Amino acid sequence: MGDHDDLRKFITDLAVVHGRVVLSSGREADWYVDLRRVTLHHEAAPLVGRVMRALTADWAYDAVGGLTLGADPIALSMLHAGGDRPLDAFVVRKAGKAHGLQRRIEGPDVSGRRVLAVEDTSTTGQSVLTAVEALREVGAEVVGVAVIVDRGAGDAVRAAGLPYRAAYTLADLGLVA
């Protein structure tokens, strides 16, 4: 098996939790995909970095990140995955800090840079579009949005004028919306 198949197995074995849950979007579901169980796993995290780099290999960007907490381990996995180009990672806070440098985006400066916004999974696109807005406010050029598992956010992200890619769909994981 390759990285893509190996990561899918980690997701289905570790991250898919069956039972009634309320998603951050407010919608209810009979299962939950808890990707932190994968993105923070010692064997799966390197796969996340390689799969997400491969998914976006034809997009030109030099920094990756998104809204904390879902995007953080993805960005770090991509940063450490190596590849044909170096990447910086950044973290977008939900709100600016009231102390210190009062930055909303932590890490290397992204002003004037081409960046990729990532998220672990997305149903409505709200979290990643919040990150995109913050990135644009500081002058970053967002080249696209990439998620590990798409729960339906593609239309909303594309409607915001951004290319969108997902490493896996719900069907890829044997789940129905």
Give each language-model segment a name.
Residues 1-58:
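Active-site-facing substrate-recognition patch
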Residues 2-10, 133-177:
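PRPP-dependent phosphoribosyltransferase catalytic core
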Residues 50, 54, 76-80, 133, ...:
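Short, well-ordered alpha-helices that flank and scaffold nucleotide-derived cofactor binding pockets
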Residues 59, 74-87, 154-170:
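Short acidic, glycine/proline-enriched helix-loop-strand junctions
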Residues 59-70, 146:
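Short glycine-rich phosphate-binding loop at a beta-alpha junction
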Residues 62, 113, 143:
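Conserved acidic residues
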Residues 72-116, 124-129:
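Short, glycine/charge-rich flexible loops or terminal/linker lids adjacent to PRPP-binding catalytic cores
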